[in-house]
Amino acid sequence: MATTVKVLAKELKRTAPDLLEQLKAAGIEKGSEDDSITEKDKTVLLEHLQKAHGSTDTGARKKITLIKRESSEIRQADSAGRTRTVQVEVRKKRVLVKAGDKAPEEVAAQPVKQVAPAAPAKPVISEEELEKRAAEATRQAELLARQEAEMKAAEEARQKEVTVPVVKEVAPVDKAPVAPAVAEKKLAADKAAKDLAASKEKELADIRARRAAAEAEALAIRDMMSAPARVLKAPSEVAAEEAKKGTLHKPAKAEGAEDKKKAATKVGGKTIKSSETSSTWQEEGTRKSGGLKTRGDTSGGVGGWRSGGGRKKQRQIAEANVDTNFQVPIEPVIRDVHVPETITVAELAHAMAVKSAEVIKLLMGMGQMVTINQVLDQDTAMIIVEEMGHKAHAAKLDDPDLDLGTEGHDAELLPRPPVVTVMGHVDHGKTSLLDKIRTAKVAIGEVGGITQHIGAYHVETPRGMITFLDTPGHEAFTAMRARGAKATDIVILVVAADDGVMPQTKEAIHHAIAGGVPLVVAINKIDKPEANSERVKAELVAEQVVLEEYGGDVPFIPVSAKTGEGIDALLENVLLQAEILELKAPKEAPAQGLVIEARLDKGKGPVATVLVQSGTLKRGDMLLAGSSFGRVRAMMDENGKPCNEAGPSIPVEIQGLSEVPAAGEAVQVMPDERKAREIALFRQGKFRDVKLAKQQAVKLENMMETIGEGAIEAKLLPLIIKADVQGSQEALSQLLMKLSIPEVKVQIVHAAVGGITETDVNLAVVSKAVIIGFNSRADAAARKLAENNGVDIRYHNIIYDAVDEVKLALSGMLIPGKKEEITGLVEIRQVFLVSKVGAIAGCLVVDGIVKRTSSVRLLRDNVVVWTGELDSLKRFKDDAKEVRAGVECGLSLKGYNDIKEGDQLEVFEVTEVARSL
């Protein structure tokens, strides 16, 4: 595909007219956006732009350097006659210069300047450190100057020793013959003086170079010492690598260099290394050997791979390293550990940079036996982190939910209808009041006359549209009422004028206050003769609901759901509260809402009642609700009529989710299925991990208590609950779990919405459970399977009946209670001792009746001495089954002979009594 002006402008992120102007300025004539551009045109344009911006480098290569390396081996014999192989590397370098530049010979003829290695970047240091370094450098300079002076004095003394004796030995001779000799000696002396001056100058230059090297080395060492402890690479390593690439830049080794390296000067009681001593201690052994090394350090030096002197030598080297190497003091590292909701022991140890054994040891000290793969909950993990001295932060790492809720913030906010929840005690007339407003007959269709679902309706009134949520009033539906208060803007509190404030009325008040929702009180049933509105007002004030007529802000409207009295005033007050709240929501945005209710329909699949809170929900949208997701296949309003979209504050029934969502879950429209699936799977895994971690924590906490108290095995009543909607299933499960006591417990094996299927029956067979169908029925296959396997299925449509039946079943599982009843009193008149039998008591039955099977207590001075059973009971010589009051008898006690005259026997019987919850 040919490149056009338009395509190039798009790649350069510029407009086509601007690019045409630049091409014209570069001398390239292009008439329109569709003209093609060649690579040559691009190069010309690039050079023009570089010149226009002041760049001298046109990007073209002017010089190419080719380096060729050749390696070979030569064999060389030493003085002992042994041959060794030396590797020789020859480097050939060729420079290719672009036409118009200097020739390679001219370039080669120029002297090569020695490029000084770049100084390592110095870290930022404080003024105190600068002063210390300056003092150290001054001291080093003084020591070197003193050393230089001493060497100079020694040289002068040596010169005097050489020259003075020669002068003394010369004999006096005649001037004429001596003149040529004197001239020669003078020339020789001048030459020697020049040589001496040159050598002194050379020595001084050498001393200066060594002093500079020593100062640089000292500065480098101090920089290394003051550098942070975790520096991985010394700054001087770059220069060292450059130095290793060639050998031409190294100076020739001077004579006596080894002596200079070993020499040290003592000044002030301190030993100072020679200035040529390198700070790289591992190369010291290599320098001492003086031989050619082709494979690194093989001389047995500190870093060598040959042992050199055996284990003793290695031990000495290791001890030398310990004594000379600088050890940075280690401080405890305090880490910020982000702890998610669940984390394994291994992950927690990795986050703290410790071994897993340390964490397991600490947990064992806290009474928890765990493995490295054990999942810990967030609270336990944070305690472990703090115990080990780190900082723990509760976090939700890698949570895709964090990306949600960012769409639609810039949309225009428009007024929306208020969402009004009707709350109150059971049978106070909430649904009847809504029926009167909607002119419908919902309450008549409710089983038992009570509401067991959340009903969502929107009503068109002359003053505007209102969305109503009708919540159950029975105590079992606390969670439903909490969800209703969460989704609402205004709460209508219905109180019966003849009944007053009841427990669920108080609970509704608490829900409204906790949610910060304004209240409107409707006193219902004012048409009844026993209605007492004043008593209701006083009870409401006692519950911190101050009415307007008492100086508060809560409207108070007497209404009658039967006659319709006060309905208009109630709606007017509701709309007035809505105007004060200024309720607004974006309409042209992805929908967000709340699951009010959910159920599993056999033909439609998962069905959810959703209240749209913002945006517009359309048919075909990808929806995410908790851990379930799916595309909206169908939408229906509260009357069962299909609809294509729903705006803010509109309740709709949707189909198409992957599973039944939990009631109260947030609903949001997602851009695509991939994102929705990712978040749903993440939530499923997180819910499972959190649940398992909490179960494990409870098991670990109760393990020692169970061992200490002794395991009391409770009887279990396994149940499988199938309900029509999520809210009813949730309420029934919670209510049945509350029936559990230590002796008998309710075990809910499975709870779900929908009809009873063969899967449920098979699960009941395995777990020996009873199936409770609440407003749901079993299909034909499930009924047949249940009959064949003896599975008990109970159907209920009123929550009271289900609870009562389970309570009765639990009562039947209780161990019967024992009741003791005193049936008679016997007085011992005489005691007979009979061999082989024991003591026989002659008695008189004072009160009641004595039976042969009765249990007795022996009383002595009204104190119980013994409790047991009768061994025999006789009347004269005959055995008797029972003896009544006023009759004498003889009896013996089983296993007890310590009977005395005057003792009494208390006769009693123990009977079993059925217990109930």
From Swiss-Prot:
Residues 252-262 have a biased composition (Basic and acidic residues). It is found in: Cytoplasm. The keyword Cytoplasm applies. Residues 560-562 are annotated as: G5. Residues 415-582 form the tr-type G domain. Keywords: Cytoplasm, GTP-binding, Initiation factor, Nucleotide-binding, Protein biosynthesis. Residues 274-283 have a biased composition (Polar residues). SUPFAM superfamilies: Initiation factor IF2/eIF5b, domain 3, P-loop containing nucleoside triphosphate hydrolases, Putative DNA-binding domain, Translation proteins. Residues 449-453 are annotated as: G2. Residues 524-527 are annotated as: G4. GO terms for cellular component: cytosol. Pfam families: EF-G_D2, GTP_EFTU, GTP_EFTU_D2, IF-2, IF2_assoc, IF2_N. Residues 298-308 have a biased composition (Gly residues). InterPro entries: DNA-bd_dom_put_sf, EF-G-like_DII, EFTu-like_2, IF2_assoc_dom_bac, IF2_II, IF2_N, P-loop_NTPase, Small_GTP-bd. GTP binds at residues 424-431, 470-474, 524-527. GO terms for molecular function: GTP binding; GTPase activity; guanosine tetraphosphate binding; translation initiation factor activity. Residues 241-312 are annotated as: Disordered. Gene3D superfamilies: P-loop containing nucleotide triphosphate hydrolases, Putative DNA-binding domain, N-terminal subdomain of bacterial translation initiation factor IF2, Translation factors, Translation initiation factor IF- 2, domain 3. One of the essential components for the initiation of protein synthesis. Protects formylmethionyl-tRNA from spontaneous hydrolysis and promotes its binding to the 30S ribosomal subunits. Also involved in the hydrolysis of GTP during the formation of the 70S ribosomal complex. PANTHER family: TR-TYPE G DOMAIN-CONTAINING PROTEIN (PTHR43381:SF5), TRANSLATION INITIATION FACTOR IF-2-RELATED (PTHR43381). HAMAP family: IF_2_B. This is Translation initiation factor IF-2. It comes from Polynucleobacter necessarius subsp. necessarius (strain STIR1).
